[in-house]
């Protein structure tokens, strides 16, 4: 049991080290919504977390999780 928790801790540490490298574009989007939303973005790795958590009001009342076509 102890060995399993050690492996889990190492895995979490590796993930925490790798995540910031793959999220360079997320904070810019989240700064619109403020610190709290930015925190959720880092947790969720989710571009539209502001809509998801209701920190930013969208044009329509229902938050959308889809990425719009450009």
Swiss-Prot record:
Q: What is this protein called?
A: U-scoloptoxin(20)-Sm1a
| Keyword check for Membrane | no
Where on the tree of life does the source sit, at the highest rank?
Eukaryota
Gene Ontology terms for molecular function: toxin activity
For whether the record's keyword set contains Oxidoreductase, the answer is no
Which region is the signal sequence? 1-24
Family per record: Belongs to the scoloptoxin-20 family.
Post-translational events: Contains 3 disulfide bonds.
Q: Which organism is it from?
A: Scolopendra morsitans
The terms describing its cellular component in GO are: extracellular region
């Amino acid at each position: 049991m102890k060995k399993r928790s050690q492996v889990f801790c190492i895995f979490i540490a590796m993930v925490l080290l790798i995540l910031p490298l793959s999220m360079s574009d997320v904070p810019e989007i989240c700064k619109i919504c403020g610190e709290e939303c930015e925190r959720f973005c880092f947790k969720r790795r989710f571009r539209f977390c502001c809509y998801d958590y209701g920190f930013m009001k969208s044009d329509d009342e229902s938050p959308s999780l889809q990425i719009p076509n450009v």
